[in-house]
From Swiss-Prot:
Domain Obg: start-end pairs: 1-159
Protein's name in the database: GTPase Obg
The UniProt record lists the keyword Cytoplasm: yes
PANTHER family tied to this protein: DEVELOPMENTALLY REGULATED GTP-BINDING PROTEIN-RELATED, MITOCHONDRIAL RIBOSOME-ASSOCIATED GTPASE 2
Any GO BP: ribosome biogenesis
Presence of the UniProt keyword Nucleus in the record: no
One Gene Ontology molecular-function label: magnesium ion binding
Keywords of the record: Cytoplasm, GTP-binding, Hydrolase, Magnesium, Metal-binding, Nucleotide-binding
Source organism: Pseudomonas fluorescens (strain ATCC BAA-477 / NRRL B-23932 / Pf-5)
Residue ranges annotated for the OBG-type G domain, each copy included: 160-333
Region feature Disordered, mapped onto this chain: 128-148, 375-407
Cofactor(s) this protein cannot do without: Mg(2+)
Binding-site residues, Mg(2+): 173, 193
């Protein structure tokens, strides 16, 4: 199934039913009082997190959703039927954003979580409601209120404990195959991975964590080059990042240069994401001589001025992967214990998570704006000079209004 992690939809709640104007008419009762019933409330629309879904592809083809309208009221004080609520199922990890205001309406991070995105219109009142001591036969009713309507943007971020970073062909997919049962495609050419892959890594019998592999980054990714930059948002919810570096590139380029590219692109995309706990994992150690290994490790560590943990592994032969997996599990457990015991630490991480979300969304929005400008024939906003501004347009309120709609 095609992996889709961003869609735009329009949702419209049901209108409320109108109130009824009716009077009681029975045998021997010629002038009975009012008996018009109220209308029914319109149906609302809810987003529901479904653990069985992993893509938003269903919303790529069907984009408009309407809830049922409430029925009109009836005679003999009959209330109209309420419109049926509509549930839209989305994968766990979906963020719902108002496309008009860019306000985050909600974040569905748990299976079964339910969020109302538009509310149905209120019912109209029947003429019975307006009966009084001075008005015995009211002919007044009210119509149902219209239901809310919204344009929404749905963003899916995979939920994983560990995220993998690296250039194409750094061995990320091979690594995830070696430590989990996931079987992502592996080949000897760049960009083999086109969508995020998840794998569950079992440590001992009852312990496990989820690891996410995203398409590789390249130099200039923060400016829109390559595939990986749009998928970096999937690492926003991870607890730890593994920076994989190919120690023996086929083109004999410098591994230190490759490592530096990833660090720079990560900083440009989100400085806060770069603050996340990050471990350096030097892969493909089996392809270089043992006497050269230490020298190459030192070169990479010195170039990056690295002070964090460093692991030298070979994903294909599983050399060093078990130790790395156990250390990750230990770190995740210690982190969870500290979160429960230290409220200040929990607040600090929550604030970091929010900054990462905000920076990632702003960066992707800027890339979308840039793409829209290119489609309109403008390379960038800086290409619009002062000569393109007509001061006469300021007072011309009757002129045409041009609205540019971003795809």
């Amino acid at each position: 199934m095609k992996f889709v992690d961003e869609v735009s939809i329009r949702v419209k709640a049901g209108d409320g039913g109108n109130g009824c104007m009716s009077f009681r008419r029975e045998k021997f009762i010629e002038n009975g009082g009012p008996n018009g019933g109220d209308g029914g409330d319109g149906g609302s629309i809810y987003m529901v997190a479904d653990e069985n879904l992993n893509t938003l592809v269903d919303y790529r083809y069907t984009r408009h959703f309407d809830a049922e309208r409430g029925s009109n009221g009836g005679s003999t004080d009959c209330t109209g039927k309420k419109g049926e609520d509509l549930e839209l199922r989305v994968p766990v990890g979906t963020t719902i954003i108002d496309a008009g205001t860019q306000e985050v309406i909600g974040d569905l991070t748990k299976a079964g979580q339910r969020l109302m995105v538009v509310q149905g219109g209120w019912h109209g009142l029947g003429n019975t409601r307006f009966k009084s001591s001075t008005n015995r036969a009211p002919r007044q009713t009210t119509p149902g209120k219209p239901g809310e309507q919204r344009d929404l943007k749905l963003e899916l971020k995979v939920l994983a404990d560990v995220g993998l970073l690296g250039l194409p062909n750094a061995g990320k997919s091979t690594f995830i195959r070696s430590v989990s049962a996931a079987k992502p495609k592996v080949a000897d050419y760049p960009f083999t991975t086109l969508v995020p892959n998840l794998g569950v890594v079992s440590v001992d019998r009852w312990k496990s964590f989820v690891i996410a592999d995203i398409p590789g980054l390249i130099e200039g990714a923060s400016d829109g080059a390559g595939l990986g930059i749009r998928f970096l948002k999937h690492l926003a919810r991870t607890r730890i990042l593994l920076h994989l570096v190919d120690m023996a590139p086929l083109d004999e380029s410098s591994p230190a240069d490759a490592a530096e590219v990833i660090v720079n692109e990560l900083m440009k995309f989100s400085p806060s994401l770069a603050e996340r706990e990050r471990w350096l994992v030097l892969n493909k150690s089996d392809q270089i001589l043992e006497e050269e290994r230490e020298e190459r490790v030192k070169e990479i560590v010195d170039r990056l001025e690295w002070t964090g943990p460093v692991y030298v592994i070979s994903a294909i032969s599983k050399d060093g992967t078990e130790r790395l997996s156990r250390d990750i599990m230990r770190y995740l457990e210690d982190r969870a214990d500290r979160l429960a015991a230290d409220p200040a630490y929990a607040d600090e991480l929550a604030e970091l998570d929010q900054r990462i979300e905000d920076e990632a969304r702003a960066q992707l929005q800027a890339l979308d704006d840039q793409r829209a400008l290119r489609r309109s024939g403008v390379k960038s906003v800086h290409d619009i000079g002062d000569d393109d501004w007509d001061e006469e347009d300021v007072d011309d309120e009757d002129g045409p209004e041009i609205i540019y709609v971003r795809d």
